[in-house]
């Protein structure tokens, strides 16, 4: 027998020929029942991912192909290294930071080759990520918010009751670090690459002039990147924000809710990482970039 319970918030109305995922239960008498779990979205997801891969390679060429390799490495690190370590009880923040640093180094080497430009970008990224982590911890302590107040933490609490030694209190800041990593890498690599070009065109420029150029370039990037991060965090929680707004809460109640405090910490801590990556990368690059040329494999 196959059951499909359909309601406004659950169940899937199916038509003849549509594929679905079933949950099959086997009883002691050998009988079976099946319940419709969800649409089978595997084919649709494969098409969407295929279009993404195709667009990346067609537009980006060799660099696009390299970026896909870097993305694959990132996913492997997150799903086969980070999550298993956290499930075994490893220190949440230290593990996340070290994995992000590893992802940064591997990604930079894949995209930029082995050179001082890449090293400077990687150092700027790691430094910016570390400051985002520290700012997140400070903000979390100041606002008295911890990982136990996250909206989706209840299933993890149930998981801990089964004996899984998962540390929950650092998940908020850990999520901030992971979310900000891509933007921080983007800013750091852009500044390092730009200063490399400036040095190539004007090799007589000293470190101070290169640093000023890096700051000028970085200021133009900070505004859009900060906007991107803030909007990304707010957009991901838009439905819950609408729900809070519909309650007609007093503004002080609204801004004091754990959810709003969590979103503020997430958005601002990520932006801090991007902002501070600008002077850090500009400083590191201006001190180091003039001494070596890249050994890139194109």
Go through the PLM ranges and name each one.
Residues 1-2:
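PDZ peptide-recognition modules
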Residues 6-43:
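Extended, hydrophilic extramembrane loops/domains of integral membrane proteins
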Residues 29-31, 59-65, 110-115, 237-254:
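Transmembrane helix-loop junctions in multi-pass membrane proteins
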Residues 36-42, 61, 65, 69, ...:
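Alpha-helical membrane-interface segments at transmembrane helix boundaries
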Residues 50-158, 169-179:
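Transmembrane alpha-helical segments that form the functional core of multipass membrane systems
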Residues 133-264, 268-269:
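Generic detector of multi-pass transmembrane helix bundles and their immediately adjacent loops
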Residues 173, 273-277:
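Hydrophobic alpha-helical transmembrane segments of polytopic membrane proteins
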Residues 289-298:
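Residue-level detector of conserved catalytic or cofactor/ligand-binding positions
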